[in-house]
Amino acid sequence: MGNPSNRTSMRGQLTLRGVVIGVLGCVIITASSAYKALKMGALPWPIIFAAVISLFFLKLMGNASLNEANVTHTIMSAGAMVAGGLAFTIPGAWMLGYADQISWLDMFIVALAGTILGLLATALIHRHFIVDAALEFPTGNAAAQTLRATEAGGKTGKQLFGSMAIAGIYSVLRDALGVVPSMLCTLNIPGVTFAIYNSPMLLSIGFLVGFAPVAFWFAGALLGNFGIIVGGTAAGLFDIVTAQGIVKSLGMGLMMGFGVAVVLKDILPQVAGIVRGLAADSSTDTDEQSLISGSLKLDAGIIGLGTAAIAVIIAVALDLGPVPAVIVTLFTFVTTIMSAQSCGQTGIDPMEIFGLIVMLIVAAFAQLAQVKLFFIAGIVAVACGLAGDVMNDFKAGAVLGTNPRAQWIGQAIGGIVGALVAAAVMVALVTAYGPDAFGPDKSFVAAQSSVVATMVSGIPSVPWFAGGFIAGIVMYWLGIPAMMIGLGVYLPFYMSLTAFLGSCVKLAYDKWAAHRDAGSGLSGKEKASKDAAFQEQGLVVASGLLGGESVVGVILAFVSVGLSLLG
């Protein structure tokens, strides 16, 4: 990727209409991402969806380049991972009874601090990971290819908004009016919530993630629910309550072991090379490679002042104190590098694991109230989540020839908007549903937050957690997706079953596409083009179903809060 002059190449890429479209989309995607992360315990990358929508709306307003769409979707998707960072950590404090000790301002400061630290870190590491190391960043690469495939236009808008409307109306009928049931095909199995969740969103998640990964997810669900809970209790090894604690501990251990294994296997061996690379980059940099101000010297000053300011803010406003604030700030830079490396090589960003690691490091050096530990995990998770999103966007920009400074500025706009929206949505949800609605087997499973809460308060079964932790590390080294298995073990069975059904639909969809093309007589290039359009159609419809239910869920929460305020 070349780096032409920032001031000239930004023209036509970072535009007023792009900013407006991006900010509006950012509000919707951030709100729906917070809801998805809490409701489903998962948050798929929104970059490809945002890329398709950005180009569609820009084309409605006239001629649009792929570079303008690239910057617009950078703004649009930025808030999603900010919301994820909050949703994967802060609700753990609600589960422990600290809801009244966390205000909207606290959550906004956590989100803003993580956003700014993530932005400053990515300004430093962009050149190394994107230009010099040239890591794959599969999600960013896919977003670039999707933009190219979508450029010709088509039925994207009708497919998207039609599916969003269907899912939204269905959600109102289910959640607001009670016309349709939330669960289907329920069976009374002691200790197991066996049912199909009547949710377009969860079916869509299974479709979007794909059959193979979700098959491992479902295998974990079968192991935890029928292997341990049903099998273990039937054999008289333990009672149902003990079995459920074992399952939660095992699931958490597998997920955390996976996250630590990513750090040990894929990231730490690269740290020395990364540091050498960053040092080499700085010796050859020119002002054209500045992402913040257009001047590298001014960038250095801004990064230094910004870092110091954030350390002071979290020390004072969040009452962490000077030493914990400095530790958090410094280790956040380290973990954003780890996040970038992980996303670049695997497409996975275990941001809540990085938050846990820094939280435990700080807890070893300082005596802080439990609620403050969640703030630390939240700051780090937001920074790492945003860093993963930024670096994927940078990769898409490298493929398309977009100016990285335009993208970084767009990411800053979207990240700050996302911090505001994410904090507001979190407050709306906990106010509307109450803190007791969050946790395992509750309305909002908040799986990652529950892991954080457990690490703070105590693990139900330490031996099973330790076994899962070791197994997670070993499985990752063997190429087995321990994170997906652990997620299946941990989540309620009805969620895993529903996601699995969605992945089966994706399997059938792919087989239908292959069968349809087999006897078409088209050339290889024509088949590839037709298949890409068919896959895009599935992506858009599934994303619309997912987005429609998520957005309506957030709207219903705000309506509930408004009605309660009116008395």
Regions found by a protein language model. Give the residues of each.
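Alpha-helical multipass membrane-protein architecture
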Residues: M1-G567
